[in-house]
Structure formats: C-alpha cells, structure tokens
C-alpha cells in the first residue's frame, strides 16, 4: 500500500485529500505546518507528498528541500493558489503542480500521471 502525506495549513483541504487518497487505497495522513511536517518526514518515508507552498510557519520550498535531503524518490505534488509559482516549483524538482482550487478529478488524473492508479 502506497503511503501519502498531505502538508497544507488549510484543514479542510487536508481532510478532503486524505479522504480521497484513502478511498483510492493509500495509507494517508496530514500535517498542518512546516514544523510537524519536518518531524514526520524525518522519521517516516512516503511514496507521495502533497505540499502547499504558503504555510503558516514557513515556505513549502524549504520543506521540499528538507524532504529531498531524506528522500530523493518520493513523488511531490505542489498544491497552491499561486499559479505564478508553477515554473519555480517544477524547477526545484516536484513531480506535478496543481493549482487551487482543484477537483477530485484533477487529483485522480495526477495520480494516473504518476502511475499510482492503474484504472
């Protein structure tokens, strides 16, 4: 079973994504800030990580850099309301960029692109 982590300071987005991921067969959890995400990423490995770029206690970019010191293989999907960040996010090595707001269909399509779903 693939493991997924959602990192976003909006609890509603975390709950929605975790619910959808669990329904699709993932073991999924979430963190609401950089501090808790750093602790989680330092002690656990994940196959898929959703990261918001603008978190209450830090930058999603810093978090991505921190993650890459531990894990170079996890797929990272940036979810952000700032469409202008797409190119920068892709340049730092994320797998996909999804603008907010997004739909369940958008998430499902992203998981297909990254080969997490077969159907």
Write out the residue ranges for each language-model feature:
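Acidic catalytic/metal-coordinating carboxylates
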Residues: 33, 59-62
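Hydrophobic/aromatic residues positioned on beta-strands within the core alpha/beta folds
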Residues: 77-79
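Acidic, metal-coordinating helix/loop segments flanking the phosphotransfer/catalytic sites
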Residues: 30-48
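Short amphipathic alpha-helix used as the core "switch/output" element in two-component signaling
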Residues: 61-72
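Two-component/phosphorelay signaling modules centered on CheY-like receiver
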Residues: 11-29
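Active-site residues of response regulator receiver
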Residues: 52
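C-terminal output helix
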Residues: 102-112
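Alpha4 helix (beta4-alpha4-beta5 surface) of REC/receiver domains from two-component response regulators
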Residues: 62, 82-98, 108
